[in-house]
Amino acid sequence: MNKLFSFWKRKNETRSQGYNLREKDLKKLHRAASVGDLKKLKEYLQIKKYDVNMQDKKYRTPLHLACANGHTDVVLFLIEQQCKINVRDSENKSPLIKAVQCQNEDCATILLNFGADPDLRDIRYNTVLHYAVCGQSLSLVEKLLEYEADLEAKNKDGYTPLLVAVINNNPKMVKFLLEKGADVNASDNYQRTALILAVSGEPPCLVKLLLQQGVELCYEGIVDSQLRNMFISMVLLHRYPQFTASHGKKKHAK
């Protein structure tokens, strides 16, 4: 899962808030947007060979780079210049995805206010909601839901935002998503539900939280027998704490 939301640094590259940038790959316009140099950006756009929607070798526009680096003034200026808001880069990521991925909430808010689509998917079918959940930002998740982001969107692995929260062991996010109506019985491509994924991870409080939501007690997606037994034990412990406690004492006495 972590590989879906991580960025790998190559030789001669510098990290730039979610984009690995090499100077030789950037046009002057893109470099200005990346560093937030609004004055230079305006100067370049007055030259005919530069266009507000110009893409680099990886199909990134100035808006992508400004959003990735949190330059709200540049974002507002580019939108005023009628730039495309839902344009995609080489990984199918929109400027909104980059803003959320890099946790630049102000940039994300601006884009949403100007009609950015919260349900566009990147090359792995992740939406902005997947990235917001992975970034553990409750405020971003709440904002995206206000703009009707799809709470049940699945990426290529079949993970909904709720499953991402469970995999990342984030009880607060799990509880928040459930309160917002997330399907507690949604499953991934291997038929693993939130409960099954929670049993195999930490902390165990996630299991209790999910069981309190009336989750379906199905363990068909658990291939490992040891994990299956753990699943059954934890369910029994939640449902019949007195029985399991006394059973454990008898076993220990023997």
Swiss-Prot record:
<keyword id="KW-0040">ANK repeat</keyword>
<dbReference type="InterPro" id="IPR036770">
    <property type="entry name" value="Ankyrin_rpt-contain_sf"/>
</dbReference>
<feature type="repeat" description="ANK 3">
    <location>
        <begin position="124"/>
        <end position="153"/>
    </location>
</feature>
<dbReference type="InterPro" id="IPR002110">
    <property type="entry name" value="Ankyrin_rpt"/>
</dbReference>
<keyword id="KW-0677">Repeat</keyword>
<protein>
    <recommendedName>
        <fullName>Ankyrin repeat domain-containing protein 7</fullName>
    </recommendedName>
</protein>
<dbReference type="Pfam" id="PF12796">
    <property type="entry name" value="Ank_2"/>
</dbReference>
<dbReference type="InterPro" id="IPR050657">
    <property type="entry name" value="Ankyrin_repeat_domain"/>
</dbReference>
<feature type="repeat" description="ANK 4">
    <location>
        <begin position="157"/>
        <end position="186"/>
    </location>
</feature>
<feature type="repeat" description="ANK 1">
    <location>
        <begin position="58"/>
        <end position="87"/>
    </location>
</feature>
<dbReference type="GO" id="GO:0005813">
    <property type="term" value="C:centrosome"/>
</dbReference>
<feature type="repeat" description="ANK 2">
    <location>
        <begin position="91"/>
        <end position="120"/>
    </location>
</feature>
<feature type="repeat" description="ANK 5">
    <location>
        <begin position="190"/>
        <end position="219"/>
    </location>
</feature>
<dbReference type="GO" id="GO:0005654">
    <property type="term" value="C:nucleoplasm"/>
</dbReference>
